[in-house]
Design a protein with these regions (language model features):
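Viral virion structural and adsorption modules
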Residues: 1-96
Length: 96
């Protein structure tokens, strides 16, 4: 998803390590070819690599328009579903 801040259209990319999101960055739409997902993703990935940032970077949607959820640190990426999955909610244990 692309969104606008002060007239700048931005895209978000998540760094994936061992299927886990470890970082999320914002990239200018101009650096993603000016288009929409999925066309913008490989162009954005090339731009991210040109900055010297290594690893696997996947575009994520702030409004969850694709890949099911906005990627946040600690989420997992399910490649089979092509979705970002939130971590499980751990309920506190009531002690007697």
């Amino acid at each position: 998803m692309l969104y606008s801040i002060r007239g700048l259209t931005m895209a978000h990319f998540a760094k994936i390590e061992n299927d886990t999101v470890t970082q999320v960055i914002v990239v200018s739409n101009d650096d993603c070819g000016g288009g929409n997902f999925p066309d913008s993703e490989p162009i954005g990935q090339t731009f991210i690599a040109s900055l010297g940032l290594t690893g696997e970077w996947l575009q994520t949607s702030y409004n969850a328009n694709f890949r099911a959820n906005y990627a946040s640190i600690g989420y997992t990426y399910d490649a089979d579903l092509d979705e970002f999955v939130p971590p499980p909610i751990i309920e506190p244990i009531d002690e007697p």
